[in-house]
């Protein structure tokens, strides 16, 4: 075969935050005594840490799919300052069930839409408890994130935003370890967006940490799920969906570098950014691209920018 044909999925066909509705969900964030101790052991210091994490997450969620997370007013009821008396075990083995029971008892089921636990037990540990369970009683409060240094931008984005992404219906986008069967694994190796595993897959790492945005396929999953549930408070933003054209499909000889140029417009006058992403799902036989790959993912995602063109590969590598 002396040609390579790639058909890029038009962004016009991907479900996104296109209905001009901002969705605000009530989130309950509990913390273990270990997390509280790491952050100084007082309500004021712990609340400041939670606020910083929530600010970083909301910056991404509001930009990518017009979703905002608002801390419940009674959240202090699930902040525990003493590891010896908190309702959580010494390991994360039963965090999912312990958190769900704690939130339903202390916050009450009707008073929150999504719940998450922050802990400082172990290293790089997290589990959403479910895929797509916001607003679902009995499951919505079962996600947790734990790390022995539970602080900083990478903790917030690589770990907490990743697990909350699962709670909102997103699956993994990495391809480093086979196929999960959801047809959304579209990033080489570890991946570099939030639903990947950047920095923790060894030889297939694309980079050390996740970039602060979701892959288009994750945006599609989360947007679809958000539109299917009804517990959010909604606000009509009046924003108009931008127009975009990624250009015609191309058929190229194997190994040929190429350039893609897109065009976009926005009648509201908003500044547009562009992000080119390959939409070929992993087929379980590929984990990392090579010059001999005949299927799977060849190109990684890069941070959105105002530049409407991209070279494949990057000019600096040719």
Feature map (PLM): residue ranges:
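The catalytic-center signature of Zn2+-dependent metalloproteases
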Residues: 72-95, 135-212, 277, 281-287
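Exoplasmic/lumenal beta-rich domain surfaces
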Residues: 70, 275-318
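Extracellular acidic, Ser/Thr/Pro-rich low-complexity tracts
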Residues: 252, 263-268
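Short, solvent-exposed loop/linker segments at the N-terminal edge
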Residues: 246, 250-258
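Extracellular acidic loop/turn motifs
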Residues: 231, 266-273, 281-284
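Residue-level signature of extracellular beta-strand-rich folds
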Residues: 246, 260-265, 276
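Fold-level signature of zinc-dependent metallopeptidase catalytic domains
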Residues: 1-132
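Proline/serine/threonine-rich low-complexity linkers at boundaries of modular beta-sandwich domains
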Residues: 222-243
């Amino acid at each position: 075969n002396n040609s390579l044909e790639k058909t890029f999925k038009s962004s016009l066909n991907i479900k996104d935050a296109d209905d001009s509705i901002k969705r605000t969900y009530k989130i309950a964030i509990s913390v273990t005594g270990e997390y509280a101790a790491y952050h100084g052991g007082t309500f004021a210091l712990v609340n400041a840490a939670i606020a910083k994490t929530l600010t970083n997450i909301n910056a991404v969620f509001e930009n990518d799919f017009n979703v905002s997370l608002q801390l419940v007013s009674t959240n202090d009821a699930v902040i525990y300052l003493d590891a010896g008396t908190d309702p959580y075990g010494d390991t994360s083995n039963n965090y999912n069930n312990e958190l769900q029971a704690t939130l339903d008892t202390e916050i009450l089921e009707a008073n929150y839409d999504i719940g998450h636990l922050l802990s400082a037990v172990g290293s790089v540990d997290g589990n959403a408890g479910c895929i797509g369970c916001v607003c679902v009683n009995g499951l919505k409060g079962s996600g947790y994130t734990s790390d022995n240094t539970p602080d900083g931008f990478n903790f917030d984005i690589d770990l907490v935003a990743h697990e909350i992404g699962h709670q909102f219906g997103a699956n993994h986008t990495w391809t480093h370890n086979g196929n999960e069967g959801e047809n959304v694994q579209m990033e080489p190796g570890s991946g570099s967006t939030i639903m990947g595993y950047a920095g923790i897959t060894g030889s297939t790492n694309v980079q050390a940490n996740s970039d602060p945005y979701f892959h288009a396929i994750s945006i599609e999953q989360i947007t679809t799920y958000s539109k299917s549930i009804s517990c959010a408070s909604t606000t009509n933003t009046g924003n108009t969906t931008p127009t975009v054209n990624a250009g015609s499909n191309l058929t190229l000889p194997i190994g040929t570098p190429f350039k893609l140029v897109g065009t976009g417009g926005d009648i509201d006058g908003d500044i547009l950014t562009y992000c080119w992403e390959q939409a070929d799902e992993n087929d379980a036989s590929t984990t990392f691209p090579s010059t001999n790959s005949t299927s799977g993912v060849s190109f990684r995602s890069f941070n959105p920018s105002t530049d409407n063109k991209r070279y494949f590969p990057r000019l600096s590598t040719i």
